[in-house]
Amino acid sequence: MNRDEARKKIIFALDVNGIAEIDRYAGLLSDRVGMFKIGKELFTACGPEAVATVRRHGGQVFLDLKYHDIPNTVAKAMLEAARLGVQLANLHALGGLEMMETAASAVRREFGDDRPRLLAVTILTSSTAETLRRVGIDHPVEEMVVRLACLAREAGMDGVVASPREIGLIRQACGPDFLIVTPGVRPSFASQDDQKRIMSPDDAVREGADYLVIGRPIAKADDPVRAVDMIVDEIVAGCP
């Protein structure tokens, strides 16, 4: 894998406090990472201007709002996300087959081939078997992840968000063309933070991840550009 292929796999999580910081990171990294992730906190604070700021720098956006509501509401929200010009958007697979089908159909109908790719969140990387048990799910994490990934594929979703530990299982169950976006990726120079099911960038790519969501190891670095370059180095070295 060459450096350009490796950098395109990196999604930088914009866990920042406002437009000025978005502008700074987008200016620094738009030609060094594949995409920028905008999540609930940032979008709630800054709204669509967060997306517009990244796009002004030529960056691509993963809008990570994890929609989970009645089918019609989620479909309308997904359409609004698509109208912002994002490349990836997601919802919770636990919302069920009808919710996912309705959203996927609505976006395909309005945008066709120019649509964003739609992802379903399986089980959050902070979750454990005990987390699931306490909400009444008595199946192992890995089993639930694969079950939800297969449901998402059946519903017409383009891929899933899942921990790196389940990449291989999802790839086996859902095939080579199903997108896998994985948080919980930590380069060798970074701490584990609050993620429970983690993996190194090169291991995740070898397992079959299409995109790696990485935030704090880049944002907390004294030199974010150098941090990205080090992550690219790890991917290239581990994925010849």
Swiss-Prot record:
Keyword Lyase: yes
Keywords carried by this UniProt record: Decarboxylase, Lyase, Pyrimidine biosynthesis
EC number(s) reported in the record: 4.1.1.23
Pathway: Pyrimidine metabolism; UMP biosynthesis via de novo pathway; UMP from orotate: step 2/2
Annotated positions binding substrate: 15, 37, 64-73, 125, 186, 195, 215-216
Biological processes, Gene Ontology terms: 'de novo' pyrimidine nucleobase biosynthetic process; 'de novo' UMP biosynthetic process
Record GO cellular component, one term: cytosol
First-level EC class: lyase
Catalytic function, reaction form: orotidine 5'-phosphate + H(+) = UMP + CO2
Active-site residues (renumbered): 66
Primary role: Catalyzes the decarboxylation of orotidine 5'-monophosphate (OMP) to uridine 5'-monophosphate (UMP).
Subunit structure: Homodimer.
Name listed for the protein in its UniProt record: Orotidine 5'-phosphate decarboxylase
